[in-house]
Amino acid sequence: MNIALISTSSRKNSNSLRFANYVRHVLTETSQHDVSIVNFENYDIPFVGQGSVKKDSLTNFQQELISAWEGADLVIFAMPEYNWTAPPQATNTIHQLGGPAFKHLFENKVFAMVGISNGRGGRQPALDMTTVVNKIISFTNSYSIVSPKLYESHETDKNLDENGQFIGHEVYERTARAFIDYTLNVSQRWLAPNLVETK
């Protein structure tokens, strides 16, 4: 399975990137998956009302993001929680890529959402992004699904080191792996050949 991990924090060495690296380590324990990470450190998508993303003049960051996303069967967003909501870069990305020019990014995909916190938060950004992505899937009449299981990465900096290696409490490791397993199972069921829309 092709899997894109999208770390939506623009901070250098963010907790969201730690989590994305952790998921990559878990997924590559076997050779069953091709995994890519996109880091929002060089984010340059204009905000709605200030410009748009043009297919024929993508920046390096935009090209990296769109290439990883369009080649993926499963797209996992890792989002920091800012004041009980998702970061603006995350939702703006969906708004800017949710139109006709990039409709294919929402076709025959499984999406999964992870909220990242250095405390006990994380739920709200995952819920916010679930709502926005579901709306785009519905509005564009696309055949994709957002996996119903969210993950809240609590005390991320205490459980994962800067390279995404697990260093923390066994409950974190157990619940994170359960989320990954569940997400993979949903993806395998959703992407079964008899369910994929014939073009």
Go through each PLM region and give its residues.
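Glycine-rich phosphate/pyrophosphate-binding loop and the adjoining helix
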Residues: 142-199
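A generic structural motif
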Residues: 30-36, 139-140
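Helix-loop-strand module that forms the ligand-binding subsite of alpha/beta enzymes
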Residues: 57-137
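N-terminal beta-loop-helix "entrance" segment that forms/cooperates
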Residues: 40-57
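Short hydrophobic segments within beta-strands
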Residues: 6-8, 38, 114
